[in-house]
């Protein structure tokens, strides 16, 4: 009901002229985007999202991400520099943050997370109402709306994040991976993530490999994970779940890995890379993800939690984290750790440091670090680190260049070398190095 009410109000905003002219374009752009995501939710609910052709998927994906693509970013309100230039310093930073948060609606619509859509809608409407007043709002009034939206709904957003990491019943991605016809690349567009030609090329390349090669890749990955428990003397039999973190495009290998893990008695969890600022890590993402539509956009918004990070918020977040893990403690106790697929060969990135982007003050930086330390203690209580393990395997992406196919096949060969033989060889090198005082590294 709240969703329907908020969407009805958002439809009205699209045609109203009740806020000062300078701010109308911002509110129209954001409401147009919200309405697009509302259409996605309808398509999910009536089943038509599942039936998209490859071309329809590409068109929808482009429409949803077009605003943050590099060619449009310079005149996008998600760009804090542009927002400040057009809306003023105080409003611009806050309203750019709000739009970036609302862009999470793409994922919420694809996953059918209606309450998350409501949270963004209601924050936008409340701020729009402030601009409808006889005088312009103070920046603090806008910031207060954003602060309390983040704080009040922390028990929704953070709790879901905890559940996402340990509960195999949340199977949005797993259903796509295990039930789709992977030879039809339209499945890539059902994740809701940005899909570039890289993901399509990777998926098409994996589709071209013989079943034996795919099995080899998956076996090396899953065997390495299971062997990690043996090497560290940890009891895998006590565990029931493993989290697979991987780059979208590798579904054919991942499907086989799921079968392998299930044969070993482990259900697979697919936790998406965090969407909202409350769950994002400024240092990078963890979870399944695609390539970014714009790495400068990610960089500009990496410290967006500076909008609300204070001691009261930190304390609230830790309290919610404890409650969430208590709620999912059985799932947490059954969790064995992550199995990670990484990639290499992506082009380099030179970020631009923008003064208009949010950044932590020294005090906020300390609060954030304190939260990280406190949260690690909470997580370790429910998922003891001495009971889990992990594995990491890496493959090239097409962006590595013309030799992609050759490098990929060579990577498979190296990854599938005789473990026993090379383990013994490496141990001999380690034994010799243990007798040394220092190592001199030479070369180019």
Which sequence ranges carry the predicted segments?
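Active-site bordering "gate/hinge" segments
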Residues: 1-444
């Amino acid at each position: 009901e709240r969703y329907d009410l908020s969407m009805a109000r958002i439809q009205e905003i699209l045609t109203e002229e009740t806020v000062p002219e300078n701010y109308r374009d911002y509110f129209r752009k954001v409401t147009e985007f919200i309405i697009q995501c509302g259409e996605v939710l309808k398509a999910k609910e009536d089943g038509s999202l599942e039936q998209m052709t490859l071309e329809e998927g590409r068109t929808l994906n482009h429409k949803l991400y077009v605003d943050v693509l590099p060619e449009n970013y310079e005149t996008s309100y998600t760009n804090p520099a542009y927002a400040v230039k057009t809306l003023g310093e105080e409003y611009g930073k806050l309203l750019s943050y709000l739009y970036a948060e609302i862009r999470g609606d793409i994922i919420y619509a694809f996953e059918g997370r209606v309450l998350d859509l409501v949270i963004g809608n209601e924050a936008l409407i409340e701020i729009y109402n402030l601009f409808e007043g006889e005088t312009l709002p103070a920046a603090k009034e806008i910031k207060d709306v954003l602060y309390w939206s983040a704080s009040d709904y922390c028990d929704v957003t953070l709790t879901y994040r905890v559940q996402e990491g340990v509960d195999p019943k949340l199977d949005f991605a797993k259903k796509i991976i295990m039930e789709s016809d992977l030879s039809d690349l339209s499945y890539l567009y059902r994740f809701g993530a940005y899909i570039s030609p890289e993901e399509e090329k990777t998926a098409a390349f994996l589709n071209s490999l013989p079943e034996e090669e795919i099995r080899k890749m998956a076996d090396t990955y899953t065997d390495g994970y299971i062997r990690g428990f043996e090497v560290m003397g940890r009891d895998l039999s006590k565990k029931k779940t493993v989290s697979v973190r991987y780059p979208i495009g590798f579904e054919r290998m991942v499907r086989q890995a799921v079968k392998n893990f299930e044969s070993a008695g482990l259900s697979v969890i697919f936790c998406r890379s965090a969407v909202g600022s409350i769950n994002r890590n400024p240092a990078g993402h963890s979870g399944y993800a695609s390539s970014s539509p714009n790495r400068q956009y990610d960089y500009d918004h990496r410290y967006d939690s500076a909008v609300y990070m204070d001691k009261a918020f930190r304390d609230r977040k830790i309290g919610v984290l404890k409650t969430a893990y208590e709620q999912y403690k059985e799932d947490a106790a059954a969790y064995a750790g992550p199995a990670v697929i990484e990639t290499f060969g992506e082009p380099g990135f030179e970020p631009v440091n923008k003064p208009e982007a949010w950044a932590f003050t020294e005090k906020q930086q300390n609060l954030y670090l304190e939260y990280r330390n406190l949260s690690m203690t909470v997580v370790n209580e429910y998922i003891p680190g001495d009971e889990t393990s992990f594995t990491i395997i890496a493959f090239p992406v097409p962006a590595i260049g013309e030799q992609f196919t050759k490098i990929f096949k060579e990577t498979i060969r190296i990854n599938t070398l005789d473990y026993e033989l090379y383990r013994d060889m490496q141990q001999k090198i380690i034994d010799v190095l243990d007798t040394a005082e220092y190592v001199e590294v030479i070369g180019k």
